[in-house]
Amino acid sequence: MKNKKSFGFPMMEEMTVQTVRQYLEKKNSVILPVGIIEQHGYHLPIITDALTAREMAKMVAKKTGILVAPVLYSSFSGGGLSGTINISPSVMSLVINDTLVSLASQGFKKIYIFLGHGGGENLNVLEISLKVLLRNNPIFSDVVLALFPVWSFDESGRGWKKAV
């Protein structure tokens, strides 16, 4: 896979349909970074949560060769300062569910969700969504879904090894 040689780890958004298929012939794991566009005071960029999730995913991908899916930039923060883009918890649940169904239907059997937003409201929405999805959708009968808040990793990125 050309992408893996160029970057040292596979990034789905940089791949072609064929290279994703080639990846799935060898591996069935994917990391889904989830962040939000929101304020972080006046000293940090509004993309901080999404960047954190993406960079942690890249760090893990570099060590494991697991594919990194494109970042989901929309989630719920409850904040309203300039630059914050909120979606409702119900829409967040739908976006997550549809994304996971899409990945599972393509053949991904191990999906690791890296949550970059530190607010408990996103964690709650994701936990409930995953439980309902696993219970009600037969496509997930042989799929492992694992949720990792990135703040549970240490400074070297350890913490993800428990499930990967």
Please state what every model-predicted region is.
Residues K26-P33, T64-S74:
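Short coil-to-beta-strand
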